[in-house]
């Protein structure tokens, strides 16, 4: 019976097909060992993928679990993605740190608030002063207007008294004050007749009389027939009597 080595291979080496024991090839044994090791590594990676997911590539010099510099910045604030309780606590502490303001910023904010409140109080005070001043000036303006109106009325009364002391004041007053409620066409005609008398020339008497008459038959509102009188006045105007 042939002796066996520790690996169960006959000491004389493997027997060939013709029953002759051959020597082991070192190169073939080395290649077989390398293939076995490679197969073992591939099997380990396959089990790791099934257990924990696909392994991600990490940048050189960065340990696993640190997020990318671009993905970890939002609006200028650094945050950590949480995949577990530890990351959640870290995110909460990060938010607390962002919410807590520095002492200088807090002091500046308080000073700004006090300054704005002072400006608002000053604006309200100035507004009240301006309103009071405007009311006072308006009252003074009304007083001046009333005083000026009273003076104007007094001056008008004095002027009227002096005017009506003149000769023919009634006639002149009616004509010169056209907007006066007592003004009438008859009074204007009377004034014109008086002026014609003062500036009359011989032979124009009947012409001045004709100017005082209305020779339009349609505009006459009188019930009496004055057609004969109109014809006489027209004839005298055209051919006045010679004294």
Swiss-Prot record:
Clathrin coats are formed from molecules containing 3 heavy chains and 3 light chains. Interacts with CALY; the interaction stimulates clathrin self-assembly and clathrin-mediated endocytosis. Interacts with CKAP5 and TACC3 forming the TACC3/ch-TOG/clathrin complex located at spindle inter-microtubules bridges; the complex implicates clathrin triskelions. It is a peripheral membrane protein. The keyword Ion transport does not apply. One of its GO terms (cellular component) is spindle. Residues 1-22, 49-87 are annotated as: Disordered. GO terms for molecular function: clathrin heavy chain binding; structural molecule activity. Its main location: membrane. Residues 10-20 have a biased composition (Gly residues). GO terms for biological process: cell division; clathrin coat assembly; clathrin-dependent endocytosis; intracellular protein transport. The modification Blocked amino end (Met) is found at residue 1. It comes from Bos taurus (Bovine). Keywords: Acetylation, Calcium, Cell cycle, Cell division, Coated pit, Cytoplasm, Cytoplasmic vesicle, Cytoskeleton, Membrane, Mitosis, Phosphoprotein. Belongs to the clathrin light chain family. The modification N6-acetyllysine is found at residues 218, 237. This is Clathrin light chain A. Clathrin is the major protein of the polyhedral coat of coated pits and vesicles. Acts as a component of the TACC3/ch-TOG/clathrin complex proposed to contribute to stabilization of kinetochore fibers of the mitotic spindle by acting as inter-microtubule bridge. Coiled coil: none annotated. It holds the Pfam family Clathrin_lg_ch. The modification Phosphoserine is found at residues 100, 201, 231. It is found in: Cytoplasmic vesicle membrane; Membrane, Coated pit; Cytoplasm, Cytoskeleton, Spindle. The gene is CLTA. Residues 95-157 are annotated as: Involved in binding clathrin heavy chain. Disulfide bonds: none annotated.
């Amino acid at each position: 019976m042939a002796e066996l080595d520790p690996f169960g291979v006959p000491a004389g080496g493997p027997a060939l097909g013709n029953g002759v024991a051959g020597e082991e090839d070192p190169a073939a044994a080395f290649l077989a060992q390398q293939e076995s090791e490679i197969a073992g590594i591939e099997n380990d990676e396959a089990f790791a993928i099934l257990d924990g997911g696909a392994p991600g590539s990490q940048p050189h010099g960065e340990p696993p679990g640190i997020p990318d510099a671009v993905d970890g910045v939002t609006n200028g604030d650094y945050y950590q993605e949480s995949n577990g309780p530890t990351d959640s606590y870290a995110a909460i502490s990060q938010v607390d740190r962002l919410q807590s303001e520095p002492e200088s910023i807090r002091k500046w904010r308080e000073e700004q608030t006090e300054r704005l409140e002072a400006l608002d109080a000053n604006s309200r005070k100035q507004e009240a002063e301006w309103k009071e001043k405007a009311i006072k000036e308006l009252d003074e303006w009304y007083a001046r207007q009333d005083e000026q109106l009273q003076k104007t009325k007094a001056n008008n009364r004095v002027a009227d008294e002096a005017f009506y002391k003149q000769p023919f004041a009634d006639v002149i007053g009616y004509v010169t004050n056209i907007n006066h409620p007592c003004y009438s066409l008859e009074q204007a005609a009377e004034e014109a007749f008086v002026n014609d008398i003062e500036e009359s020339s011989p032979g124009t008497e009947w012409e001045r009389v004709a100017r005082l008459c209305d020779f339009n038959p349609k505009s006459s509102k009188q019930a009496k027939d004055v057609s004969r009188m109109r014809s006489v006045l027209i004839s005298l105007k055209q051919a006045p009597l010679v004294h």
